[in-house]
Amino acid sequence: MNVIPCSIKTLKGLYDISGVEVGQHLYWQIGALQIHAQVLITSWVVIAILLGSVIIAVRNPQTIPSGGQNFFEYVLEFIRDLSKAQIGEEYGPWVPFIGTMFLFIFVSNWSGALLPWKIIQLPHGELAAPTNDINTTVALALPTSVAYFYAGLTKKGLGYFRKYIQPTPILLPINILEDFTKPLSLSFRLFGNILADELVVVVLVSLVPSLVPIPVMFLGLFTSGIQALIFATLAAAYIGESMEGHH
């Protein structure tokens, strides 16, 4: 007797899922420019969280750190170790870049799971983690490519381009293609993982709106942190590779 009500409930859940549209966006028209408002809003929130946390934690620095200052010093030490492991002894100038990438992506990813973006109603689309949008991930990957070339040219000058014909000139097209695929792989990997994680949670909440999605949400938090670490590690590895000249 309970089969029909359960079936109706399941169909209703599937109908709700069909209403989830990934491609809807809210745009701001500024002159001739069309600005993707959702990404800007959520990115500003993430930046405000990062800046606010740092200002509060280190507004009264102590010789013996404690509390928030101790936490951020631990984070800085972690980023230094990561940069040194991938880049080598010349890692110092790249710590701010790698740290900025890691912290922004980490907080952006976690904001998708922890902040109630859905409460804010928009005329079109809905708010989500900044890294849930391909525009953000590409915008993060492109500076990594610029840093990659800058590091190589700064270290080796025009001799940097010799790597494209090593070990044989026949590999020139493949070596050039490799440099173009690096930012693509960084951006699509991050975008795909964060989007998939949020969609899985939406589907489970629509079908089983109880405690079942909670383990998936915790798994999403873990995956989000790993994705930030992977992005920062690969960015540092690419920079180190361009400076050392080995593959």
Swiss-Prot record:
It is found in: Plastid, Chloroplast thylakoid membrane. Pfam families: ATP-synt_A (PF00119). GO terms for cellular component: chloroplast thylakoid membrane; plasma membrane; proton-transporting ATP synthase complex. Keywords: ATP synthesis, CF(0), Chloroplast, Hydrogen ion transport, Ion transport, Membrane, Plastid, Thylakoid, Transmembrane, Transmembrane helix, Transport. The chain crosses the membrane at residues 38-58, 95-115, 134-154, 199-219, 220-240. F-type ATPases have 2 components, CF(1) - the catalytic core - and CF(0) - the membrane proton channel. CF(1) has five subunits: alpha(3), beta(3), gamma(1), delta(1), epsilon(1). CF(0) has four main subunits: a, b, b' and c. This is ATP synthase subunit a, chloroplastic. It comes from Dioscorea elephantipes.
